[in-house]
């Protein structure tokens, strides 16, 4: 109901935009082939999909209205999408769907930005709150977000979200709802320091739906994050991130638990080359299901490998040591940019020191004007957790 009230407000605001209105069309398309082969399934999954987004933004002075729809079509549907398809194939979470992706009213000035309605939200590195853009039905929030910059170098970001529109689309049901209501509060305060941006945060996640793990994904996380970069030579830059958080149960969650999160990450950029390494820990409490550190609203694909084996943190938690490198080129043979990347992960449990498995991730990306082509591969080799998995993507994105 609150979403439609917000939408009605957007329509009612129309006369205020009658003169000197800037129109910005929004149009993008994605074509993708995704192949997924897991050792614990009889057959592999193959999904050839086409995702289109289309919309319009109207802007006058500090005010803007934006509306955008997204649709996903399965051209080849030899896969289980989480809702439909052969259950003897592994899940590729891209069900066919047509839905409103964004419908928002925004006021923007130098010290204050307020956005109301269905919107895309990505906070910091999106570990806790993100848009899950890798999936064709990306996540959005019915929310009011306020961003305040009272003085230079200080920013307060506050969001109240009453509904999360999930990747499962309009036909979502059961544990994979199309939307999950609740009283979600996201707050962070960032300050510029000589070492980088220091952010304190509080994320209150309310998955207030009994069919979604019996409320056990509702949690509250409080923590701090430092992200910065500095030149260490004329053509060399060091980038780094440090983060800590503590999580516990929240609202209707019937399980009492407490778990910690740690991240240390560093990358060195030298003349187009990058090497990086990091250590991320999602801690565990007593070893029971969903008493480990969970981030159900984050862009989890960005973390702990692309094979998607650890999107829900195991009961004994996870420790991820990773290292990688890559190289990027500009204006190479008519291509605007070309990049290559490789990352290796070693996964251990936080409790009991179990070796879950190892994973390799490989990515090649080329961009020419408005079109980007990417080839991605993930290989997970299981030891004490899940099953051997190979995943391959061939993807083309076009943005107007």
What is each of the regions a protein language model found here?
Residues 290-316:
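Flexible internal linker/loop segments at domain or repeat junctions
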Residues 384-399:
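C-terminal beta-signal and terminal closure region of outer-membrane beta-barrel proteins
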Residues 20-24, 58-65, 108-114, 132-289, ...:
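Signature for the C-terminal beta-barrel architecture of outer-membrane proteins
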Residues 35-50, 60-104, 121-135, 169-171, ...:
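Surface-exposed loop and membrane-interface regions of Gram-negative outer-membrane beta-barrel proteins
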Residues 22-42, 314, 319-321, 325:
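Short glycine/proline- and aromatic-enriched beta-strand/turn motifs that initiate or cap beta-hairpins
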Residues 1-4:
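Positively charged n-region of N-terminal signal peptides that target proteins for export
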């Amino acid at each position: 109901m609150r979403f439609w009230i917000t939408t009605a407000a957007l329509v009612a605001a129309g006369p205020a935009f009658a003169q000197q209105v800037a129109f910005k069309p929004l149009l993008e398309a994605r074509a993708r082939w995704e192949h997924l082969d897991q050792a614990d399934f009889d057959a592999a999954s193959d999904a050839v999909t086409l995702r289109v987004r289309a919309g319009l933004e109207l802007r006058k002075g500090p005010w803007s209205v934006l509306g955008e729809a997204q649709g996903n079509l399965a051209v080849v549907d030899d896969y289980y999408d989480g809702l439909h398809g052969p259950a003897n194939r592994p899940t590729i979470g891209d069900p066919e769907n047509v839905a409103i992706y964004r419908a928002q009213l925004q006021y923007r000035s130098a010290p204050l930005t307020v956005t109301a309605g269905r919107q895309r939200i990505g906070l910091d590195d999106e570990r806790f709150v993100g848009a899950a853009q890798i999936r064709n039905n990306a996540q959005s929030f019915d929310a009011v977000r306020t961003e305040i910059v009272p003085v230079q170098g200080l920013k307060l970001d506050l969001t109240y979200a009453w509904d999360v529109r999930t990747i499962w689309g309009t036909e979502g049901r059961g544990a994979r709802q199309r939307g999950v209501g609740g009283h979600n509060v996201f707050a962070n305060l960032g300050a510029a320091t000589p070492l980088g941006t220091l952010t304190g945060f509080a994320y209150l996640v309310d998955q207030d739906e009994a069919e979604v793990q019996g409320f056990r994904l509702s949690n509250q996380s409080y923590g701090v994050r430092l992200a910065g970069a500095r030149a260490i030579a004329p053509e060399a830059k060091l980038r780094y991130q440090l983060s800590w958080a503590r999580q516990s149960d929240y609202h209707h969650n019937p399980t009492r638990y407490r778990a910690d999160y740690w991240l240390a990450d560093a990358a060195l950029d030298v003349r187009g080359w990058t090497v990086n390494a990091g250590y991320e820990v999602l801690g565990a409490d007593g070893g029971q299901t969903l008493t480990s550190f969970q981030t159900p609203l984050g862009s989890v694909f960005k973390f702990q490998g692309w094979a998607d084996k650890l999107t829900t943190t195991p009961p004994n938690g996870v420790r991820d040591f990773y290292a990688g490198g890559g190289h990027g080129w500009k204006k190479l043979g008519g291509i605007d940019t070309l990049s290559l990347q490789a990352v290796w992960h070693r996964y251990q449990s936080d409790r009991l020191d179990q070796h879950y498995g190892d994973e390799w991730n490989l990515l090649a990306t080329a961009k020419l004007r408005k079109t980007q082509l990417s080839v991605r591969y993930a290989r997970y080799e299981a030891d004490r957790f899940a099953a051997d998995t190979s995943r391959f993507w061939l993807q083309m994105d076009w943005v107007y």
